Regions:
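Histidine- and aromatic-enriched segments that form or immediately flank copper-ligand environments
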Residues: 29-157, 222-254, 272-275
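A structural feature that tracks compact, well-ordered secondary-structure segments
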Residues: 215-217, 225-230, 264-266
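Short, well-ordered beta-strand elements within core beta-sheets of diverse protein domains
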Residues: 114-118, 204, 261-264
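Cleavable N-terminal signal peptides
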Residues: 24-25
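Acidic-aromatic/histidine active-site loop/patch
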Residues: 163-211, 217-221
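A conserved active-site cap/scaffold subdomain adjacent to cofactor or substrate pockets
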Residues: 262, 267-272
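N-terminal secretory signal peptides and thylakoid transit peptides that target proteins
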Residues: 1-16
Length: 275
């Protein structure tokens, strides 16, 4: 069959319309998760307000809990006036979905959005955060409230516990200080567990004899933290999302930036204790 120019143009137009329709259909298909990046005024204690950028109006961002091996779609909407990007820390996913510029992932333009599609693995405690370069601006990148926990549920038998609690550590109002070799060190005015300073958060209520599994993330840009639960020892069952080959009971743990730890605690001493 001979194809004249008019028939070709009609066919090409229909193909373009079909492509546009497919794009529109994809845009209308709801994602499994939606993250909105936007400025936030965060009150970490009475009278202490942090001006930052966060996901979905809170710090940390929403917990993403997803079965291992099940595909997921995540829409990220950038409601700031600068380009942004989201990195899925600890996941084995294609480089263009990874959310790291050095791996080839594109930035999300100011006012723009992007859909990430991948299959989360491996199982364990992962997290997501901005991968935008802060440079000399200590109110951008990892210094902001752009972080959240991503827990990939294992296909294997789950651990035995009575409660499961996610905690994130972060530091705020960074500034450069020191002198000599320390002139490039970052210092901070405030530190928080989740979104509150120590002494201003809601208490964690447990019953005597319960086994509580804590998932703790150090989301600070540069600060290392020590963590202990007064009156108790903690059992380390996982590090950076992976089960440890041999569990260990310790009085305290040390977390460098971006490190995660899974701690099992037997609540065997009634009273009020400080974490």
């Amino acid at each position: 069959m001979r194809l004249n120019r008019r028939d070709f143009l009609i066919g090409a137009s229909l193909a373009l319309l079909g492509t546009a329709a497919n794009k529109k259909l994809c845009a209308q298909t709801p994602a499994d998760v939606r993250l909105e990046i936007a400025p936030l005024k965060l009150e970490i204690a009475p009278g202490k307000v942090i001006h930052t950028v966060a996901y979905n109006g809170g710090v940390p961002g929403p917990l993403i809990r997803w079965p291992e091996g099940k595909p997921i779609t995540i829409d990220v909407v950038n409601q700031t006036d600068v380009p942004e990007i989201v990195h899925w820390h600890g996941l084995w996913i294609p480089s263009d979905e990874d959310g790291a510029l050095e791996e080839g992932s594109p930035m999300i333009a100011a006012g723009g959005q992007r859909r990430y599609s991948f299959t989360p693995r491996p199982a364990g405690f992962r997290w997501y955060h901005t991968h935008a370069f802060a440079g000399h601006d200590l109110k951008r990148g990892g210094y902001t409230g752009q972080f959240g926990c991503f827990y990939i549920e294992s296909k294997q038998a789950p651990s035995v516990h009575d409660q499961e609690i996610f905690l994130t550590l972060h530091d705020w109002n960074a500034y450069m200080g020191g002198g000599g070799d320390a002139s490039m060190d970052a210092f901070y005015d405030y530190a928080t567990i989740n979104d509150r300073m120590l002494g201003h958060g809601d208490p964690i209520k447990v019953r005597e004899g319960q086994r509580v599994l804590f998932h703790v993330l150090n989301a600070s840009a540069t600060a290392t933290h020590w963590l202990a639960l007064a009156g108790h020892e903690v059992t380390v069952v996982g590090m950076d999302g992976n089960e440890v080959p041999q569990q260990a009971r310790v009085p305290a743990v040390r977390l460098a930036p971006a490190e995660r730890i899974d701690l099992l605690v037997e609540m065997n001493r009634p009273g009020v204790w400080v974490l």
